Amino acid sequence: MGSRDHLFKVLVVGDAAVGKTSLVQRYSQDSFSKHYKSTVGVDFALKVLQWSDYEIVRLQLWDIAGQERFTSMTRLYYRDASACVIMFDVTNATTFSNSQRWKQDLDSKLTLPNGEPVPCLLLANKCDLSPWAVSRDQIDRFSKENGFTGWTETSVKENKNINEAMRVLIEKMMRNSTEDIMSLSTQGDYINLQTKSSSWSCC
């Protein structure tokens, strides 16, 4: 059997300085720097994965500048995306509350071919820092109320939960690409990455 290629466009959005560029660099190149310059407009990276013996996944990662939510360009950037990651800084409550605006902007401009919202993970980044400005209960409630696929804490600096979270997103996109699109009865739940990379805490 010949190999099958899957190409997915994944948006990485959120306020400035929450770690979007760091996430893209960590995931695509396994590198981290404290000295990234602020993204202007949009930046791109490619991640290629041997998903199975006969399937290759190519992720086109779109790192969208935090200021772009206030421009009309987001509709162009969002076009044809298969999934999204919305990030916030757990030590900054404003970036958390603004995640709702990013999600609303996304949902108003982008849907799957069947009209459903695209899969979207909420990443609580910089979890290695303290104190947190929001509680886990707040994040959990927020994720469910705003229609996220799920959420988890991440530390790009310490490379915590990055590959695991992205795997959950890829699995969701792969299911969608085979037209097995079913709404989860429970959405927005915390993604338990410790027990199994693709498990949901509600299961």
UniProtKB/Swiss-Prot annotation:
It comes from Homo sapiens (Human). Changing residue 73 to S: Loss of LRRK2 binding. Does not stimulate LRRK2 kinase activity. Localized to the cytosol. Interacts with LRRK2 (via the N-terminus); this interaction is direct and stimulates kinase activity. Changing residue 67 to L: Reduces membrane localization of LRRK2 and impairs RAB29-stimulated LRRK2 kinase activity on RAB10 and LRRK2. Reduces membrane localization of LRRK2 and impairs RAB29-stimulated LRRK2 kinase activity on RAB10 and LRRK2. In case of Salmonella enterica serovar Typhimurium (S.typhimurium) infection, is proteolytically cleaved between Gly-41 and Val-42 by the GtgE viral protease encoded on the Gifsy-2 lysogen bacteriophage, which therefore prevents the recruitment of RAB29 to S.typhimurium-containing vacuoles. In contrast, no proteolytically cleavage is detected in S.typhi-infected cells. A lipid is attached at residues 202-203 (S-geranylgeranyl cysteine). A motif (Effector region) lies at residues 36-44. It is found in: Cell membrane; Cytoplasm; Cytoplasm, Perinuclear region; Golgi apparatus. PANTHER family: RAB FAMILY, RAS-RELATED PROTEIN RAB-7L1-LIKE ISOFORM X1. It comes from the Eukaryota. InterPro entries: P-loop_NTPase (IPR027417), Rab29/Rab38/Rab32 (IPR030697), Small_GTP-bd (IPR005225), Small_GTPase (IPR001806). Its main location: membrane. Keywords: Cell membrane, Cytoplasm, Cytoskeleton, Differentiation, Golgi apparatus, GTP-binding, Lipoprotein, Membrane, Nucleotide-binding, Phosphoprotein, Prenylation, Protein transport, Transport, Vacuole. Belongs to the small GTPase superfamily. Rab family. This is Ras-related protein Rab-7L1. GTP binds at residues 33-37, 39, 126, 156-157. The modification Phosphothreonine is found at residue 71. One of its GO terms (molecular function) is GTPase activity. The modification Phosphoserine is found at residue 72. GO terms for biological process: cell differentiation; cellular detoxification; Golgi organization; intracellular protein transport; melanosome organization; mitochondrion organization; modulation by host of viral process; negative regulation of neuron projection development. Changing residue 72 to E: Loss of phosphorylation by LRRK2. Does not stimulate LRRK2 kinase activity. The record marks 41-42 as: Cleavage. It is a lipid-anchor.
